[in-house]
Amino acid sequence: MLEVIKLKHNTPEWLEFRNGRIGASDAAAVLGRSNWKSNQELWEEKIGLRKHVEFPEDERIGYGAAVEELNLKLFAVQYADKYKVKTNKTVVYVKDGFQFASLDGELEDIKTGELGIYEGKEVWVDSSLVWEKWKNKIPDQYYCQVLHQLLTTGRKFVVLNPTFRWIDRDGEIATKTRRITIRLSDAGIMEDIKYLDEAEHEFQEYVKRKERPPRLLPPL
């Protein structure tokens, strides 16, 4: 069951709400595909044994939060002929009572009327491995996140908007932005969403029973 509730993001009430529930940023850890925490560490967070940690790179996360609204406004200007863009930081999408998502932006395709999702990302490029992870694909951490957003909102597509940032040879900050659209109708997406949904329900049963799940290791 899908529902929409009013809850201002990042308030004490919102932080309390997410306790024991699975958000988009948790999805990769549920599957053992997170770069930052294991499924067992996530379980410890959900039952209160460990303090919730979003990501360890606090300074970079702070930068991303600072430019998030600017990037969304730029996207809205650049795609004004294609999408209606809005942001609502008082809406949380909930599925089955425990799966939830709060969105960076909400999209409406002007031509078709389809509803979609805007998801912004700031990616710090500190080695060639970062480019390799994004070469013709989406890293697992972010792919799982957008699958979860599609799952919990019932929307038809996501536009992932990663902005890559690095220091160039002159010591100046350089940036490059990509736009990646993922649709429910794309090959394999519905199957991947079903797999994630089943895994999240299984994980939630471990949370409810306070039984530690088997440890899942990320693929090499």
What feature does the model see in each segment?
Residues M1-L220:
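Accessory terminal regions of nucleic-acid processing enzymes
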